[in-house]
Amino acid sequence: MVGDTLKLLSPLMTRYFFLLFYSTDSSDLNENQHPLDFDEMAFGKVKSGISFLIQTGVGILGNSFLLCFYNLILFTGHKLRPTDLILSHLALANSMVLFFKGIPQTMAAFGLKYLLNDTGCKFVFYYHRVGTRVSLSTICLLNGFQAIKLNPSICRWMEIKIRSPRFIDFCCLLCWVPHVLMNASVLLLVNGPLNSKNSSAKNNYGYCSYKASKRFSSLHAVLYFSPDFMSLGFMVWASGSMVFFLYRHKQQVQHNHSNRLSCRPSQETRATRTIMVLVSSFFVFYSVHSFLTIWTTVVANPGQWIVNNSVLVASYFPSRSPFVLIMSDTRISQFCFACRTRKTLFPNLVVMP
């Protein structure tokens, strides 16, 4: 008796839960929709929200750990490597991407769509785009730095400069300033969440909306993504140079030693492989994200699944790249082992900051 009653009440409770947490102004709802459609829709949105939540939370933790580790090296008096300076900026840019895109999209997936006003939406989109472009520029800088370090004949006058921390800091600063200025146009295009008052907005991202004419959207997309495609082309060229140099170097080593010595990869080779993994993954997912972004910008009222997939693809690299760096950096494993050993030998020892 009780079981039959619960079976009858379950669809009604699910529909009440959906209507309670999800706004009825959304374009996804229809007056003639069956209650079972509400169940499937609620399950799909909760599943998307959980995916956003896990990916964003894990990525923020990984990037925060990297930032703390690099700052710890600096504060303890040790000297940072030139690549550490670049990777610290990359971790900061990735954190911005996850914080200003992943968190709002997670809230929108769970039905919290109207927490941001018009000003909040503008700055969330602005900081997200700045973080995305800085991440792209930083990857290009890291790729070019390693290519010149492996093969100085590419640009001989840069060989000495790339060893200077001041020069690396200046290059990292150049990765920020242009994008801080160029992305100011986002403040004019983004509005608050889509509702009955601004139903003429072109694209709805769940928590914010985008409004512009078709002609202006196409022009903005071309001007916005042209530097990105140039940067991706530079990545391909620098990565190809590194692959060619490593292949030629491997052939020379095998010829000189005739395979009598153990071919143990050097530190530069391991670093280059790590950078190649980062660059290749960034290239693939950023290209897919750019295509989806252009699609949602040019096409009127894109499907919500396109918007969700665009956010997932955009967050893939920022959420996984810190763990590639953590696993490839031997200093981190040595640091964790030292902390564990100290805690085992001196369990009552309190380490002062």
Curated annotation (Swiss-Prot):
> Principal place where this protein is found?
membrane
Note one Pfam family from the annotation. Answer: V1R
Supply the InterPro entries for this chain.
Answer: GPCR_Rhodpsn_7TM (IPR017452), Vmron_rcpt_1 (IPR004072)
A biological process (GO) of this protein is:
sensory perception of chemical stimulus
Membrane topology is:
Multi-pass membrane protein
> Sites of glycosylation?
N117, N198
* Transmembrane domains' residue ranges: 57-77, 85-105, 133-153, 170-190, 227-247, 275-295, 304-324
> What GO molecular function annotation could you give as one example from this UniProt entry?
pheromone receptor activity
A single GO cellular-component term on record: plasma membrane
* Primary role: Putative pheromone receptor.
Family as reported in the entry's similarity comment: Belongs to the G-protein coupled receptor 1 family.
Name of this protein: Vomeronasal type-1 receptor 1
Source species: Gorilla gorilla gorilla (Western lowland gorilla)
Give the classification, highest ranks.
Answer: Eukaryota, Metazoa, Chordata, Craniata, Vertebrata
